[in-house]
């Protein structure tokens, strides 16, 4: 029998103050997964965060410049023709509008492209048709990513009732989680060496390379080498982009 959402399940568990104060990205992820699974019957999370200004272009470009993590089923991910954002109407709607979007909203169907309709068929095949996407924002209220919450065993009407009544609480929990998770997780992805992070920190403060080299007791050539390595590790085409990512992902 499907376990139904209960409104009372959301009363206390969505308090952002309950999020652990930890720098361990895996521990934080497991906490969110267990909390939503135990109390809300959410099974499967997708997380995406990217620096503001990087949102233009195709989803393939965006996801390459972002950090993301998911607990969606492996067979579902392998069946996708592209990455998780490819032809995902709900996810792209959230990233464009900043509005909560239900995966199974019937009003969305007429607006979908052929590829997006094919994605819906794939979702149904892998029992991924019920869920919702939530946006995350910068302090200036610009969209910088979001979460997908997949409910495997939920009745759509019950799930919609919970989203309608508690989307604000869920949104606050996810937003606060992002603030605590983004830095620790980004560090596991970019793996900057201490000197590379230090160089980016000086650049973020507006310091020129020559002065930076003097400050660190290094040659300009060595500093340039650190900058090049930092660009590569952060998948940045320029040093300015690497600095922007370092600031956004709390690496400096």
State where each predicted segment sits:
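Short, hydrophobic-rich beta-strand element in sensory/regulatory alpha-beta domains
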Residues: 32-37, 42-60
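Regulatory sensory and allosteric helical modules in signal-transduction proteins
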Residues: 65-115, 121-124
């Amino acid at each position: 029998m499907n376990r139904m959402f209960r409104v009372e399940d959301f009363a206390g568990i969505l308090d952002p103050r309950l999020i652990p104060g930890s720098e361990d990205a895996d521990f934080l992820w497991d906490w969110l997964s267990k909390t939503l699974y135990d109390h809300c019957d959410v099974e499967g999370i997708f997380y995406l965060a990217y620096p503001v200004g990087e949102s233009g272009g195709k989803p393939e470009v965006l996801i390459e410049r972002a950090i993301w993590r998911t607990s969606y089923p492996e067979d579902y991910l392998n069946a996708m023709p592209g990455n998780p954002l490819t032809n995902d109407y709900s996810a792209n709607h959230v990233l464009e509008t900043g509005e909560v979007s239900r995966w199974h909203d019937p009003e969305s169907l007429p607006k979908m492209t052929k590829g997006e309709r094919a994605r819906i068929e794939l979702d149904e095949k892998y029992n991924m048709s019920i869920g919702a996407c939530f946006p995350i924002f910068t302090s200036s209220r610009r969209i910088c990513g979001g979460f997908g919450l997949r409910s495997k065993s939920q009745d759509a009407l019950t799930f919609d009732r919970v989203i309608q009544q508690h989307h604000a609480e869920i949104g606050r929990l996810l937003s606060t989680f992002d603030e605590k998770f983004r830095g620790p997780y980004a560090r596991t992805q970019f793996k900057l060496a201490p000197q590379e992070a230090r160089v980016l920190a000086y650049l973020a403060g507006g310091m020129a390379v020559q002065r930076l080299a003097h400050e660190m007791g290094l040659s300009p050539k060595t500093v340039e080498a650190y900058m090049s390595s930092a660009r590569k590790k952060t998948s940045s085409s320029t040093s300015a982009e690497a600095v922007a990512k370092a600031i956004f992902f709390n690496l400096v």
